[in-house]
Amino acid sequence: LQNMVDELNRLIDDADKARAADRQFIEDLRGVDNQYDGPWRKTIVDEDFTDGYMAKKSSWQTIAGDFQLRRGLGLYSDVQARQQPAPGSSSQTSSEEAAALLIGAIFDQAMKKDKKETATSRQHDDYASIASKKTVSNAFAIDMTLDVSSLEGQFEIGVYQGNPNGNGYRLVFQPGAGNGSIELLRLGSRGKSIIDLRDKLSAKGDQIHRLQWTRTKVGNMSISLNGKTILQTADRSFKDKYTGIVMNKQGGAFAVKQLTVQGT
């Protein structure tokens, strides 16, 4: 695409110099051309996961949960939370012991602890994360095709500095039939914060969705869903390069079909 844009630029310049077309027509052509002529000329990642193979030197590493390559589908994860047995359901617990546990604050504390551990276990069970150590310029363009099997869960892609849980940006996509959402997050020394949010999106399950995310050298960011611009915002918190790309999944079933990351 960039080669075509460069060639179009050359033809427009030649037509302008030769006065071969109306001035307004030339300006209109430049306006269309500028929509596709970005500063991201260097390809950092170019993956077609549907062929069942990782690209050479891609260095993807699973950090948590499970991701699998499936020919025709892509990089797939459908790790689901395991239900924990309800407190007191064990057949080995006698009625006398159960009655004793019902007495006083000891039982209350035990219940609170059990609920907390169960929630933590569920969160870990349906979470999956994969990352690749790649130097990404501060200005970047990410283009991802995602197969969404249901309306459950959320998928996240981002760039980081240091380690996959380190400082950087995250784009969080949650499918939904009229209640989907896209969040742009910043992870910094003070924790996680929302830069911008768009909700009430129509992003149905059992469909393929395309996410595009660009960042310019001055920190302007744009996010598109299926060719439609959803968010336009700016953040200048990070001025250095990023050291990797991370993808996280929480619940649901998602498959990354194609992923392209470009830089300057």
Residue ranges of each PLM-predicted region?
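Extracellular carbohydrate-recognition regions
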Residues: L1-A64, Q80-T93
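Beta-strand-rich interaction surfaces with strong enrichment in secreted/lumenal proteins
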Residues: N34-Q35, Y127-K134, D196-A203, V246
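Short tryptophan-centered beta-strand motifs in secreted/extracellular beta-sheet-rich domains
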Residues: F49, I142-M144, D206-I223
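Short, exposed beta-strand/loop patches in secreted or surface proteins that constitute
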Residues: W60, A64-R71, L171-P175, W213-T214, ...
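Secretory/extracellular carbohydrate-interaction modules
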Residues: Q80-L187
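Short, aromatic/His-centered strand-loop micro-motif at the edge of beta-sheets
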Residues: L187-Q212
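Short strand-turn-strand beta-turns centered on an Asx-Gly dipeptide
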Residues: S224-T229
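Flexible glycan-contacting loops in extracellular carbohydrate-active proteins
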Residues: T233-V261
